[in-house]
Design a protein with these regions (language model features):
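Cys/His-rich short segments
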Residues: 118-171, 175
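N-terminal Rossmann-like or analogous alpha/beta NTP/dinucleotide-binding catalytic cores
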Residues: 2-121, 135
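Intrinsic disorder at enzyme termini
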Residues: 475-569
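Helix-rich, typically C-terminal accessory recognition domains appended to large enzymatic cores
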Residues: 123, 129, 332, 337, ...
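Short, glycine-/Ser/Thr-/acidic-enriched flexible segments
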Residues: 13-14, 136, 212, 232-235, ...
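Structured secondary-structure scaffolds
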Residues: 1-48, 103-107, 151, 157-371, ...
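Phosphate-backbone binding interfaces of nucleic-acid-interacting proteins
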Residues: 542-673
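Short secondary-structure capping/junction motifs at helix and strand boundaries
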Residues: 89-96, 116-129, 141-142, 156-158, ...
């Protein structure tokens, strides 16, 4: 019988900067699923990679003083780059694609031409709004408060000659796919796609650009570069040899369509609407599932490289082990929902589950076997009534685990395993091996208790392999498990270990962590890491710019105590609520933000020295407090005029900053008393 196949992918990540814990979360989940299917005996193909073209990369490379290719090479292949991170995290991908690979470039040109010749791509002119970070075009009606509906950042006016894909042609078929099949998971994502994007009317999609050069040229019209939709999405097929000779045709025939694409929920629209429509145009089979997982939140907000509010997976994996981090990511957060990340949660999970439960069970079992039998269990063993509950749980574990894994419910699958581990620890207390050891008459009973513990541990370890592969090999070594005891089939059979098993007392696989001490050290390490990164990325400012920044910072942030003023003097200050309508960084300064605010009567410009603490996109649409009757202040040698001051406060001795935000319901122009 032919071996069953399973093809799973991560998104291909955009290498504008080092990857963070959110990217690691998705990749670890994909790796766990791939390992699970291999454990079941499937022929698995696991693809990951990087999406390396686009205007943002071109701009980042220019800022860094290197070519775009050099820039992405460093992020992907350089020290602590993408590939190094996946090696550290023990990611078992079968194939890694870079969209700058020659075979992919050639294939994309063929795909673009085929869709053009079919009439599904045509030349026109794009006029509308464009979000550079998302590389997305939007109509006026799709904007939210004048900003990109995906990321909330400001958009710019764009007009250029472009090729378009007839997305509107496939609207009905895509709608039917989403509504009437389980193509998009979890199903809670379907209504958002249908009601927000399809039902209002799908417009044809811009699929080429002329305003930048870092991309794949359209071979029959080389002033155009192929836009991200075709370039990036078709990686899932070109990596299998589709329309190229890099890999054998049999790879595509064997593995396509994909069984599941794991993606972050922010790119569900691309994968559930644009991707199937393009495959329909190419008369290609559709993926079986697209699963849009939730975000890892930090302090209640989405992690973002551009915002700088990210967690470094290197620091955590090197400090606690890749397996501990892998386990935490998939144990603490339901895969389809958002979850709040914190170092405290990580350390508590390591202590509770890995040190107290799993590690303790292994060390107690092997230590007692060593102490009472020299590590060699006797073959004479007596069953007891206390055994039934544990054995029943252990024998039924694989079926419960399988049901959860097939639903991509990793949190539940791990909870099932650790419920049995918890039962095994309680079984030790119930059977009291130290009492049984006092009499030769109860030694056979003691041997059976230790065998039950070792065999329960073996079954649990088989099922933990997709999540903690290195740790599981250490446990197997201490339990002296042969290859046939590590298989999927063996997890359903209690009694695979020989009755006279030899157990080895080994290292403590997860030492307990001093939480208070560790959290303090982590905080210091992360602060030092962040400061070093900021210093490395901050070029020297011109003196005139620094002077302007210093003035803005001292006026808005320092707030030194001055001499007292009278009540009448204070009443002269006009304090009002204003809505931030636009905000951008300034080319002339790394510290100043240029805000356009509406004060209830007119828009005004305010320059504020808060760029170190706030990303522009985090302020747009917010209601803030301003000093509205401050005399206009020329800045940057008169190039700009700042027409007010925002409310900001020092938050710590290092010069942290917070801003007073007002509820959305507060009208712009409201007086502050």
């Amino acid at each position: 019988m032919d071996q069953k196949k399973f093809y799973i992918t991560t998104p291909i990540y955009y290498p504008s900067d080092k990857l963070h814990i959110g990217h690691t979360y998705c990749t670890v989940a994909t790796d766990a699923m791939a390992r699970y299917k291999r454990l079941q005996g499937y022929n698995v193909k696991f693809l990951t990679g990087t999406d390396e073209h686009g205007q943002k990369i071109e701009l980042k490379a220019k800022e860094a003083g290197v070519t775009p290719q050099q820039f992405v090479d460093n992020i992907v292949e350089g020290p602590k780059g993408v590939k190094d991170l996946w090696k550290l995290m023990n990611i078992s991908y079968d194939r890694f694609i870079r969209t700058t690979d020659d075979y992919h470039v050639a294939a994309i040109q063929k795909i673009f031409k085929k869709m053009y010749e079919k009439g599904d791509i045509y030349k026109g002119k794009y006029v509308g709004k464009y979000c550079t970070p998302c590389e997305s075009f939007w109509t006026e009606s799709q904007l939210v408060n004048g900003c990109c509906p995906d990321c909330g950042r400001p958009v710019v006016d764009a007009e250029e000659e472009a090729y378009f894909f007839r997305l509107s042609k496939y609207a009905d078929r895509v709608r039917d796919l989403l509504v009437n099949t389980d193509f998009l998971l979890p199903r809670s994502r379907v209504n958002e796609m249908v009601h927000n994007f399809i039902d209002p009317g799908l417009e044809d999609l811009c699929v080429s650009r002329t305003s930048f050069k870092w991309g794949i040229p359209v071979d029959f019209d080389p002033k155009h570069v192929v836009y991200v939709w075709i370039d990036a999405l078709f990686n899932y097929t070109t990596a299998l040899g589709f329309m190229n000779d890099k890999y054998p045709d049999s790879d595509y025939e064997t593995f396509w369509p994909a069984d599941v694409h794991f993606i972050g929920k922010e790119i569900v629209r691309f994968h559930s609407i644009i991707w199937p429509a393009m495959l329909m145009s190419m008369d290609m089979p559709l993926p079986k599932h697209v699963y849009g997982h939730g975000w890892l939140l930090l302090d209640g907000g989405k992690m973002s490289k551009s915002k700088g509010n990210v967690v470094d997976p290197y620091l955590l994996a090197e400090r606690y082990s890749a397996d501990a981090l892998r386990y935490f990511l998939l144990r603490d957060f339901p895969f389809g929902s958002d979850g709040n990340f914190s170092n405290e949660l990580l350390i508590n999970r390591i202590n509770m589950d890995l040190a107290n439960d799993l590690g303790n069970l292994l060390s107690r079992t092997t230590a007692m076997a060593d102490k009472y039998f020299g590590g060699n269990l006797p073959i004479e063993q007596d069953e007891g009534p206390e055994d039934a509950a544990l054995l029943e749980k252990a024998r039924g574990l694989r079926d419960r685990y399988e049901a959860d894994m097939e639903a991509y419910a990793f949190q539940n699958a791990l909870a099932d395993v650790f419920e049995v581990i918890d039962n095994a620890n309680k079984y030790i207390d119930a059977t009291a091996p130290w009492v049984l050891a006092k009499s030769e008459d109860t030694k056979p009973r003691l041997a059976r208790v230790l065998y039950n513990l070792a065999e329960t541990l073996r079954i649990c370890t088989v099922l933990l392999q997709p999540f903690m592969p290195t740790t599981c090999e250490k446990i197997f070594a201490q339990l002296n498990v042969e290859a046939d005891g590590k298989t999927w089939d063996s997890a359903a059979a209690f009694g695979t270990l020989p009755a006279n098993a030899t157990l080895h007392k080994g290292e403590n696989i997860f030492p307990r962590i001093d939480a208070a001490k560790e959290l303090a050290e982590l905080e210091a390490l992360e602060a030092a890491q962040k400061a070093a990164a900021q210093a490395a990325n901050a070029p020297a400012e011109e003196k005139e710019v620094k002077s302007a920044e210093s003035g803005a910072a001292s006026a808005e942030l320092i707030g030194e105590h001055e001499e007292e003023i009278t009540f009448d003097d204070f009443c002269k200050v006009e304090l009002r609520v204003a809505e931030v309508r636009a905000c951008e960084r300034m080319k002339e300064s790394k510290k100043l933000l240029h805000l356009t605010v509406f004060d209830g009567e007119r828009e005004r410009c305010i320059l504020s020295g808060i760029a170190k603490w706030f990303a522009p996109e985090d302020l747009i649409g917010k209601k803030i407090g301003i000093v509205a009757n401050l005399a206009p202040r020329p800045m940057m040698k008169g190039k700009y005029v700042s027409e007010g001051m925002i409310f900001a406060a020092d938050t710590d001795v290092d010069g942290g900053c917070s801003i007073a935000f007002f509820p959305d319901s507060t009208p712009a122009g409201a007086r502050i008393h």
